[in-house]
Amino acid sequence: MIAKADAVVIGGGIMGASTAHFLTKLGFGEVALVEKRKICGGSTQYSAAHVRQHYSNEVGIRLAVRGASMFAHAEEELGGPAGFVQIGYMLFAPPEGEQGLRDVIPVQQGFGVETLLLTPDEVMERWPQLRLDDVALACYEPTSGFANPVLTVESLVRSAQRDGLHLYEGCEVLGISTANGRVTGVVTGDGEIATSVVVNACGPWGDRIGRMIGVDYPITFSREHEAIFDVPDGFQDFPVISDVPQCFYCRPFVGGKVLVGEGWRKQKEPVDPENYDDGTDEAHVRGMVPKLLNRIPSLAPTLRRPNYGGTFVTGYSGVYDITEDWYPIVGEEEVGGYYSCFGGSGHGFKIGPAIGESLAAAIAGQAPPIDISSLSGARFSEGKTFGSVWGPGNRA
Protein backbone atom coordinates (compact mmCIF):
# COMPACT_ATOMS: atom_id res chain seq x y z
CA MET A 1 0.00 0.00 0.00
CA ILE A 2 1.29 3.44 -0.90
CA ALA A 3 2.05 5.72 2.05
CA LYS A 4 0.75 8.91 0.45
CA ALA A 5 -1.79 9.84 -2.21
CA ASP A 6 -3.13 13.06 -3.65
CA ALA A 7 -6.65 11.64 -3.39
CA VAL A 8 -8.24 8.55 -1.84
CA VAL A 9 -11.60 7.40 -3.18
CA ILE A 10 -13.50 5.08 -0.85
CA GLY A 11 -15.93 2.74 -2.61
CA GLY A 12 -15.65 0.74 -5.82
CA GLY A 13 -19.17 1.14 -7.21
CA ILE A 14 -20.28 3.40 -10.04
CA MET A 15 -19.75 6.68 -8.14
CA GLY A 16 -16.29 5.81 -6.82
CA ALA A 17 -15.09 4.20 -10.03
CA SER A 18 -16.27 7.18 -12.09
CA THR A 19 -14.61 9.72 -9.80
CA ALA A 20 -11.35 7.75 -9.77
CA HIS A 21 -11.47 7.37 -13.55
CA PHE A 22 -11.81 11.10 -14.15
CA LEU A 23 -9.30 12.11 -11.48
CA THR A 24 -6.65 9.95 -13.15
CA LYS A 25 -7.73 11.17 -16.58
CA LEU A 26 -7.08 14.72 -15.36
CA GLY A 27 -3.63 13.70 -14.15
CA PHE A 28 -4.44 14.42 -10.49
CA GLY A 29 -1.25 12.92 -9.10
CA GLU A 30 -1.40 9.69 -7.10
CA VAL A 31 -4.98 8.42 -6.76
CA ALA A 32 -5.98 5.43 -4.64
CA LEU A 33 -9.29 3.54 -4.75
CA VAL A 34 -10.09 1.59 -1.58
CA GLU A 35 -12.86 -1.02 -1.63
CA LYS A 36 -13.96 -3.18 1.31
CA ARG A 37 -15.03 -6.06 -0.94
CA LYS A 38 -14.20 -6.09 -4.64
CA ILE A 39 -14.96 -3.51 -7.30
CA CYS A 40 -18.67 -3.47 -8.05
CA GLY A 41 -19.19 -5.76 -5.06
CA GLY A 42 -21.88 -3.60 -3.45
CA SER A 43 -25.18 -2.11 -4.58
CA THR A 44 -24.08 -1.22 -8.13
CA GLN A 45 -23.81 -4.86 -9.18
CA TYR A 46 -27.55 -5.29 -8.59
CA SER A 47 -28.62 -2.19 -10.50
CA ALA A 48 -31.30 -2.55 -13.17
CA ALA A 49 -28.87 -0.29 -15.08
CA HIS A 50 -31.47 1.78 -16.88
CA VAL A 51 -30.04 4.69 -18.83
CA ARG A 52 -32.87 7.22 -19.04
CA GLN A 53 -33.02 11.01 -19.11
CA HIS A 54 -36.46 11.62 -17.60
CA TYR A 55 -35.93 14.00 -14.66
CA SER A 56 -37.77 17.02 -13.30
CA ASN A 57 -34.87 19.28 -12.25
CA GLU A 58 -32.12 20.93 -14.26
CA VAL A 59 -29.19 19.25 -12.54
CA GLY A 60 -30.78 15.81 -12.82
CA ILE A 61 -31.61 16.32 -16.48
CA ARG A 62 -28.15 17.65 -17.35
CA LEU A 63 -26.43 14.76 -15.54
CA ALA A 64 -28.69 12.21 -17.22
CA VAL A 65 -28.12 13.69 -20.69
CA ARG A 66 -24.37 13.65 -20.18
CA GLY A 67 -24.55 10.15 -18.74
CA ALA A 68 -26.49 8.82 -21.72
CA SER A 69 -23.89 10.28 -24.06
CA MET A 70 -21.12 8.64 -22.05
CA PHE A 71 -22.77 5.23 -22.24
CA ALA A 72 -23.32 5.66 -25.97
CA HIS A 73 -19.60 6.38 -26.40
CA ALA A 74 -18.30 4.19 -23.59
CA GLU A 75 -14.98 3.17 -25.13
CA GLU A 76 -13.98 6.82 -25.42
CA GLU A 77 -15.68 8.25 -22.34
CA LEU A 78 -15.57 5.41 -19.81
CA GLY A 79 -12.40 3.68 -20.90
CA GLY A 80 -14.00 0.48 -22.17
CA PRO A 81 -17.25 -1.31 -22.95
CA ALA A 82 -20.37 -0.71 -20.85
CA GLY A 83 -22.71 -3.18 -22.53
CA PHE A 84 -25.00 -0.31 -23.51
CA VAL A 85 -28.07 -1.28 -25.53
CA GLN A 86 -29.72 1.80 -27.04
CA ILE A 87 -33.18 0.29 -27.16
CA GLY A 88 -35.04 3.41 -26.01
CA TYR A 89 -37.00 4.31 -22.88
CA MET A 90 -40.72 4.85 -22.50
CA LEU A 91 -42.78 6.11 -19.56
CA PHE A 92 -46.52 5.58 -19.16
CA ALA A 93 -48.50 8.21 -17.26
CA PRO A 94 -51.93 7.66 -15.69
CA PRO A 95 -54.66 10.32 -16.13
CA GLU A 96 -53.63 12.10 -12.93
CA GLY A 97 -50.05 12.33 -14.21
CA GLU A 98 -50.82 13.54 -17.72
CA GLN A 99 -50.45 17.27 -17.04
CA GLY A 100 -47.20 16.82 -15.14
CA LEU A 101 -45.77 14.88 -18.05
CA ARG A 102 -46.90 17.56 -20.51
CA ASP A 103 -45.26 20.21 -18.33
CA VAL A 104 -41.89 18.50 -17.88
CA ILE A 105 -41.22 17.32 -21.44
CA PRO A 106 -40.52 20.85 -22.81
CA VAL A 107 -38.16 21.43 -19.87
CA GLN A 108 -36.28 18.24 -20.70
CA GLN A 109 -36.15 19.12 -24.38
CA GLY A 110 -34.74 22.53 -23.46
CA PHE A 111 -31.79 20.83 -21.76
CA GLY A 112 -31.10 18.53 -24.68
CA VAL A 113 -33.18 15.42 -24.04
CA GLU A 114 -34.40 13.77 -27.22
CA THR A 115 -37.90 12.92 -26.03
CA LEU A 116 -41.41 13.14 -27.41
CA LEU A 117 -44.96 12.72 -26.21
CA LEU A 118 -47.03 9.84 -27.57
CA THR A 119 -50.71 9.06 -27.21
CA PRO A 120 -51.66 5.47 -26.32
CA ASP A 121 -52.77 4.93 -29.92
CA GLU A 122 -49.40 6.12 -31.22
CA VAL A 123 -47.61 3.77 -28.83
CA MET A 124 -49.72 0.81 -29.95
CA GLU A 125 -49.06 1.55 -33.61
CA ARG A 126 -45.45 0.55 -32.94
CA TRP A 127 -45.97 -1.97 -30.13
CA PRO A 128 -49.40 -3.54 -30.73
CA GLN A 129 -48.78 -6.23 -28.07
CA LEU A 130 -49.37 -3.66 -25.32
CA ARG A 131 -52.59 -3.00 -23.42
CA LEU A 132 -52.84 0.68 -22.45
CA ASP A 133 -56.37 1.09 -21.06
CA ASP A 134 -55.08 2.89 -17.95
CA VAL A 135 -52.49 5.06 -19.75
CA ALA A 136 -53.33 8.67 -20.61
CA LEU A 137 -50.03 9.70 -22.19
CA ALA A 138 -46.52 8.38 -22.76
CA CYS A 139 -43.10 9.80 -23.48
CA TYR A 140 -40.37 8.09 -25.47
CA GLU A 141 -36.59 8.63 -25.48
CA PRO A 142 -35.00 6.83 -28.46
CA THR A 143 -31.40 7.45 -27.30
CA SER A 144 -31.85 5.81 -23.89
CA GLY A 145 -31.68 2.13 -22.95
CA PHE A 146 -29.77 -0.01 -20.47
CA ALA A 147 -26.22 -1.12 -19.75
CA ASN A 148 -24.21 -3.73 -17.86
CA PRO A 149 -23.30 -2.38 -14.40
CA VAL A 150 -20.43 -4.75 -13.65
CA LEU A 151 -18.83 -4.30 -17.07
CA THR A 152 -19.17 -0.52 -16.76
CA VAL A 153 -17.40 -0.35 -13.40
CA GLU A 154 -14.69 -2.75 -14.54
CA SER A 155 -14.02 -0.57 -17.59
CA LEU A 156 -13.79 2.59 -15.49
CA VAL A 157 -11.40 1.04 -12.98
CA ARG A 158 -9.18 -0.69 -15.54
CA SER A 159 -8.92 2.54 -17.50
CA ALA A 160 -7.97 4.40 -14.33
CA GLN A 161 -5.35 1.76 -13.53
CA ARG A 162 -3.80 2.29 -16.94
CA ASP A 163 -3.52 5.94 -15.95
CA GLY A 164 -1.85 5.08 -12.64
CA LEU A 165 -4.68 4.34 -10.18
CA HIS A 166 -3.70 2.35 -7.09
CA LEU A 167 -6.50 -0.18 -6.41
CA TYR A 168 -6.92 -1.86 -3.01
CA GLU A 169 -9.67 -4.46 -2.86
CA GLY A 170 -10.62 -6.33 0.32
CA CYS A 171 -9.42 -3.27 2.22
CA GLU A 172 -11.72 -1.88 4.90
CA VAL A 173 -11.60 1.76 5.98
CA LEU A 174 -11.37 2.03 9.76
CA GLY A 175 -11.07 5.78 10.16
CA ILE A 176 -10.29 9.15 8.60
CA SER A 177 -7.57 11.33 10.12
CA THR A 178 -8.02 15.10 10.38
CA ALA A 179 -6.07 18.11 11.61
CA ASN A 180 -6.98 21.79 11.71
CA GLY A 181 -10.33 21.18 10.04
CA ARG A 182 -8.98 19.19 7.09
CA VAL A 183 -8.55 15.53 6.24
CA THR A 184 -5.01 14.24 6.51
CA GLY A 185 -5.33 10.53 5.88
CA VAL A 186 -7.36 7.35 5.58
CA VAL A 187 -6.80 4.53 8.05
CA THR A 188 -7.43 1.05 6.62
CA GLY A 189 -6.97 -2.50 7.80
CA ASP A 190 -3.86 -2.64 5.62
CA GLY A 191 -2.31 0.61 6.79
CA GLU A 192 -2.76 4.38 6.55
CA ILE A 193 -2.59 6.52 3.44
CA ALA A 194 -1.73 10.16 4.01
CA THR A 195 -3.87 12.39 1.79
CA SER A 196 -5.50 15.81 1.63
CA VAL A 197 -8.51 14.63 -0.42
CA VAL A 198 -11.00 11.91 0.52
CA VAL A 199 -14.05 11.02 -1.58
CA ASN A 200 -16.73 9.05 0.24
CA ALA A 201 -18.42 7.07 -2.53
CA CYS A 202 -19.55 4.19 -0.34
CA GLY A 203 -23.21 4.00 -1.35
CA PRO A 204 -25.20 2.33 1.45
CA TRP A 205 -22.14 2.56 3.69
CA GLY A 206 -21.60 6.27 2.98
CA ASP A 207 -23.28 7.48 6.16
CA ARG A 208 -21.06 5.23 8.28
CA ILE A 209 -17.90 6.62 6.72
CA GLY A 210 -19.20 10.17 7.14
CA ARG A 211 -19.86 9.67 10.83
CA MET A 212 -16.17 8.91 11.31
CA ILE A 213 -15.56 12.66 11.04
CA GLY A 214 -18.90 13.96 12.22
CA VAL A 215 -20.64 14.29 8.84
CA ASP A 216 -24.04 12.66 9.29
CA TYR A 217 -27.02 12.60 6.94
CA PRO A 218 -30.42 10.93 7.38
CA ILE A 219 -29.92 8.13 4.86
CA THR A 220 -32.43 5.27 4.75
CA PHE A 221 -32.01 1.90 3.08
CA SER A 222 -34.39 -0.21 1.04
CA ARG A 223 -34.09 -3.68 -0.42
CA GLU A 224 -34.88 -3.57 -4.13
CA HIS A 225 -35.94 -6.70 -6.00
CA GLU A 226 -35.50 -7.73 -9.62
CA ALA A 227 -37.04 -10.83 -11.23
CA ILE A 228 -36.01 -12.33 -14.57
CA PHE A 229 -38.28 -14.41 -16.81
CA ASP A 230 -37.93 -16.21 -20.12
CA VAL A 231 -40.30 -14.67 -22.66
CA PRO A 232 -41.33 -15.46 -26.24
CA ASP A 233 -39.51 -14.00 -29.21
CA GLY A 234 -40.43 -10.40 -29.91
CA PHE A 235 -40.07 -8.89 -26.47
CA GLN A 236 -36.53 -7.81 -27.32
CA ASP A 237 -38.13 -5.16 -29.55
CA PHE A 238 -39.57 -3.33 -26.54
CA PRO A 239 -37.81 -0.35 -24.94
CA VAL A 240 -37.20 0.03 -21.24
CA ILE A 241 -40.66 0.70 -19.79
CA SER A 242 -41.48 2.73 -16.67
CA ASP A 243 -45.09 1.86 -15.92
CA VAL A 244 -46.31 4.55 -13.52
CA PRO A 245 -49.97 3.37 -13.39
CA GLN A 246 -48.86 -0.06 -12.17
CA CYS A 247 -45.74 0.98 -10.21
CA PHE A 248 -43.33 -1.32 -12.00
CA TYR A 249 -40.74 -1.36 -14.76
CA CYS A 250 -39.53 -3.93 -17.24
CA ARG A 251 -36.92 -4.21 -19.92
CA PRO A 252 -35.36 -6.79 -22.20
CA PHE A 253 -32.62 -8.88 -20.60
CA VAL A 254 -29.86 -10.79 -22.36
CA GLY A 255 -30.74 -14.18 -23.80
CA GLY A 256 -34.39 -13.59 -24.68
CA LYS A 257 -35.48 -12.71 -21.17
CA VAL A 258 -37.24 -9.85 -19.39
CA LEU A 259 -36.20 -8.10 -16.18
CA VAL A 260 -39.04 -6.84 -13.99
CA GLY A 261 -38.89 -4.64 -10.89
CA GLU A 262 -40.94 -2.39 -8.66
CA GLY A 263 -41.16 1.20 -9.91
CA TRP A 264 -42.51 4.55 -8.73
CA ARG A 265 -43.87 4.90 -6.16
CA LYS A 266 -41.74 2.32 -4.38
CA GLN A 267 -42.63 0.98 -0.97
CA LYS A 268 -39.45 0.98 1.09
CA GLU A 269 -38.32 -2.34 2.54
CA PRO A 270 -35.93 -1.41 5.38
CA VAL A 271 -32.77 -3.48 5.36
CA ASP A 272 -29.30 -3.70 6.88
CA PRO A 273 -26.82 -3.39 3.98
CA GLU A 274 -24.43 -5.65 5.87
CA ASN A 275 -26.93 -8.42 6.48
CA TYR A 276 -29.73 -9.12 4.01
CA ASP A 277 -30.83 -11.76 1.50
CA ASP A 278 -29.62 -10.72 -1.96
CA GLY A 279 -32.03 -13.11 -3.67
CA THR A 280 -35.65 -12.23 -4.33
CA ASP A 281 -38.85 -13.30 -2.60
CA GLU A 282 -41.72 -15.37 -3.96
CA ALA A 283 -44.08 -12.58 -2.90
CA HIS A 284 -42.23 -10.14 -5.15
CA VAL A 285 -42.35 -12.49 -8.12
CA ARG A 286 -46.05 -13.15 -7.55
CA GLY A 287 -46.71 -9.41 -7.39
CA MET A 288 -44.90 -8.60 -10.63
CA VAL A 289 -46.51 -11.23 -12.86
CA PRO A 290 -50.06 -9.75 -12.92
CA LYS A 291 -48.66 -6.34 -13.78
CA LEU A 292 -46.60 -7.76 -16.61
CA LEU A 293 -49.61 -9.71 -17.92
CA ASN A 294 -51.89 -6.70 -17.74
CA ARG A 295 -49.48 -4.64 -19.81
CA ILE A 296 -48.47 -7.41 -22.25
CA PRO A 297 -51.41 -9.87 -22.43
CA SER A 298 -49.67 -12.03 -25.03
CA LEU A 299 -47.45 -13.39 -22.24
CA ALA A 300 -50.47 -14.95 -20.51
CA PRO A 301 -50.34 -18.43 -22.11
CA THR A 302 -46.93 -18.94 -20.55
CA LEU A 303 -46.95 -16.99 -17.28
CA ARG A 304 -50.37 -18.22 -16.15
CA ARG A 305 -49.21 -21.82 -16.04
CA PRO A 306 -48.20 -23.38 -12.70
CA ASN A 307 -44.82 -22.08 -11.58
CA TYR A 308 -45.11 -19.41 -14.32
CA GLY A 309 -44.71 -22.08 -16.95
CA GLY A 310 -41.15 -22.64 -15.80
CA THR A 311 -40.18 -19.22 -17.13
CA PHE A 312 -38.94 -17.72 -13.86
CA VAL A 313 -35.16 -17.79 -14.23
CA THR A 314 -33.75 -15.99 -11.22
CA GLY A 315 -34.05 -12.94 -9.04
CA TYR A 316 -31.82 -10.76 -6.93
CA SER A 317 -31.96 -7.82 -4.56
CA GLY A 318 -29.78 -4.78 -4.09
CA VAL A 319 -29.86 -1.91 -1.63
CA TYR A 320 -30.88 1.68 -2.31
CA ASP A 321 -29.24 4.37 -0.17
CA ILE A 322 -31.99 6.96 -0.10
CA THR A 323 -31.83 10.65 0.78
CA GLU A 324 -34.74 12.79 1.91
CA ASP A 325 -35.42 14.09 -1.62
CA TRP A 326 -34.17 11.08 -3.61
CA TYR A 327 -31.20 12.99 -5.04
CA PRO A 328 -27.55 12.15 -4.25
CA ILE A 329 -25.31 14.07 -1.89
CA VAL A 330 -22.26 15.37 -3.73
CA GLY A 331 -19.68 17.96 -2.77
CA GLU A 332 -17.12 19.13 -0.25
CA GLU A 333 -18.15 19.18 3.40
CA GLU A 334 -17.12 21.50 6.24
CA VAL A 335 -14.13 19.27 6.90
CA GLY A 336 -11.81 20.51 4.16
CA GLY A 337 -10.82 18.00 1.52
CA TYR A 338 -13.62 15.59 2.43
CA TYR A 339 -16.17 15.06 -0.35
CA SER A 340 -19.47 13.22 -0.15
CA CYS A 341 -20.58 11.27 -3.21
CA PHE A 342 -23.35 8.86 -2.26
CA GLY A 343 -27.10 8.66 -1.66
CA GLY A 344 -27.86 7.66 -5.24
CA SER A 345 -31.47 6.79 -4.32
CA GLY A 346 -31.81 4.50 -7.33
CA HIS A 347 -30.42 7.04 -9.82
CA GLY A 348 -26.72 6.48 -9.19
CA PHE A 349 -25.88 4.21 -12.10
CA LYS A 350 -27.24 6.36 -14.91
CA ILE A 351 -25.87 9.66 -13.58
CA GLY A 352 -22.82 8.30 -11.75
CA PRO A 353 -20.32 8.79 -14.59
CA ALA A 354 -21.42 12.40 -15.13
CA ILE A 355 -21.24 13.08 -11.39
CA GLY A 356 -17.75 11.57 -11.26
CA GLU A 357 -16.62 13.77 -14.14
CA SER A 358 -17.86 17.00 -12.56
CA LEU A 359 -16.73 16.12 -9.04
CA ALA A 360 -13.25 15.23 -10.28
CA ALA A 361 -13.02 18.57 -12.07
CA ALA A 362 -14.09 20.44 -8.93
CA ILE A 363 -11.51 18.56 -6.83
CA ALA A 364 -8.83 19.43 -9.38
CA GLY A 365 -9.75 23.12 -9.19
CA GLN A 366 -11.33 23.21 -12.63
CA ALA A 367 -14.77 24.36 -13.72
CA PRO A 368 -16.98 21.26 -13.72
CA PRO A 369 -18.80 20.46 -16.99
CA ILE A 370 -22.05 20.47 -15.00
CA ASP A 371 -22.71 22.65 -11.96
CA ILE A 372 -23.39 20.11 -9.20
CA SER A 373 -23.30 22.58 -6.31
CA SER A 374 -27.06 22.13 -5.77
CA LEU A 375 -26.38 18.51 -4.76
CA SER A 376 -24.48 19.65 -1.67
CA GLY A 377 -25.68 18.10 1.57
CA ALA A 378 -26.19 21.63 2.88
CA ARG A 379 -29.46 21.73 0.93
CA PHE A 380 -31.23 19.78 3.67
CA SER A 381 -30.56 22.38 6.36
CA GLU A 382 -31.01 25.29 3.94
CA GLY A 383 -34.45 24.21 2.72
CA LYS A 384 -33.23 23.71 -0.84
CA THR A 385 -34.26 20.11 -1.40
CA PHE A 386 -35.49 18.90 -4.77
CA GLY A 387 -39.06 18.22 -5.81
CA SER A 388 -40.54 16.30 -8.72
CA VAL A 389 -43.53 16.58 -11.02
CA TRP A 390 -44.38 13.08 -9.81
CA GLY A 391 -44.42 14.05 -6.15
CA PRO A 392 -42.31 12.48 -3.40
CA GLY A 393 -40.53 9.27 -4.27
CA ASN A 394 -37.99 7.69 -6.55
CA ARG A 395 -39.32 9.19 -9.80
CA ALA A 396 -37.10 12.29 -9.55
Show which residues each predicted segment covers.
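Beta1/beta-strand and adjacent pyrophosphate-binding region of the FAD-binding site
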Residues: I2-M15, A32
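Glycine-rich FAD pyrophosphate-binding loop
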Residues: T24-T44
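Dinucleotide-binding Rossmann-like beta1-alpha1 core, especially the glycine-rich loop
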Residues: A48-R126, C247-Y249, A283
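Short beta-strand to alpha-helix junction loop
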Residues: E58, R62-V65, L91-G100, C139-R158, ...
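Helical element adjacent to the flavin cofactor pocket in flavoenzyme catalytic cores
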Residues: C139-S196
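Central helical "cap/lid" subdomain
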Residues: G191-P239
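Active-site lid/adjacent beta-loop-alpha segment flanking the redox-cofactor pocket in flavoenzymes
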Residues: V231-G336
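C-terminal catalytic lobe of FAD-dependent flavoproteins
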Residues: P290-A396
